[in-house]
């Protein structure tokens, strides 16, 4: 009797592998990319709803960063956009170590030829020339090919007597190309001066973030300057400026709302209204084309 009292209890043993298999089979699976977290308010958003809302949070209005392909889809009449100069190739003029490999890798990852897509299309049946920068390609940095493609697009707009719209997003000049990158500021600005002499319309749409040499040149030369809500727009970084002037800057400094309040831009336009606003502006100025 005492022997049975202190007998070791027998347990059913389950291997760790069986437990993991059970969890895997009985846990609901959610496909990758179905839900997205808003980086401003923290709301979990259904991807399909987000796309229907032009990639803007339906709770706080935060505008997610989008690429050139998405902008083309949202902006132009269906099947009217024709891309220009996609075969223009980036070189490595300074023989910067690793630059060639980096460019090829980014091309493969993004399926983009460079940090800007240029071409012609129709908005509400009105033809326009457009240049759309893309942050996925080296943070939209401005190298010699970016400057060349934008300049060519402006020159074609002059030949075709069409308005120009440029969507900016950039971290600034591309350091791997040195002075050749910086000279694109003057090159594009010079082409825009010719566009202005011809009396043609130039609209610039500033998106998050627009900084550095792009801000210091063609981003701020538009006849009409629009911006998306809460976009970061500036030349040097906020902390750099604070350390230089030894003063604390306003919390919303370099945001599109701050720039509108101080007269640097003309209007803040939510992405969902952008096509309608651009169509209205082009229609108002079409007699000058």
Curated annotation (Swiss-Prot):
It holds the Pfam family Carboxyl_trans. Binds 1 zinc ion per subunit. Gene3D superfamilies: 2-enoyl-CoA Hydratase, Chain A, domain 1. A zinc finger (C4-type) spans 38-60. InterPro entries: AcCoA_carboxyl_beta (IPR034733), Acetyl_CoA_COase_Trfase_b_su (IPR000438), ClpP/crotonase-like_dom_sf (IPR029045), COA_CT_N (IPR011762), Znf-ACC (IPR041010). One of its GO terms (biological process) is malonyl-CoA biosynthetic process. One of its GO terms (cellular component) is acetyl-CoA carboxylase complex. It is found in: Cytoplasm. Keywords: ATP-binding, Cytoplasm, Fatty acid biosynthesis, Fatty acid metabolism, Lipid biosynthesis, Lipid metabolism, Metal-binding, Nucleotide-binding, Transferase, Zinc, Zinc-finger. Its main location: cytoplasm. Its EC number is 2.1.3.15. GO terms for molecular function: acetyl-CoA carboxylase activity; ATP binding; carboxyl- or carbamoyltransferase activity; zinc ion binding. It comes from the Bacteria. It catalyses: N(6)-carboxybiotinyl-L-lysyl-[protein] + acetyl-CoA = N(6)-biotinyl-L-lysyl-[protein] + malonyl-CoA. Pathway: Lipid metabolism; malonyl-CoA biosynthesis; malonyl-CoA from acetyl-CoA: step 1/1. Residues 34-289 form the CoA carboxyltransferase N-terminal domain. Its cofactor is Zn(2+). Zn(2+) binds at residues 38, 41, 57, 60. Component of the acetyl coenzyme A carboxylase (ACC) complex. Biotin carboxylase (BC) catalyzes the carboxylation of biotin on its carrier protein (BCCP) and then the CO(2) group is transferred by the transcarboxylase to acetyl-CoA to form malonyl-CoA. Acetyl-CoA carboxylase is a heterohexamer composed of biotin carboxyl carrier protein (AccB), biotin carboxylase (AccC) and two subunits each of ACCase subunit alpha (AccA) and ACCase subunit beta (AccD). Belongs to the AccD/PCCB family. HAMAP family: AcetylCoA_CT_beta. This is Acetyl-coenzyme A carboxylase carboxyl transferase subunit beta. It comes from Clostridium botulinum (strain Loch Maree / Type A3).
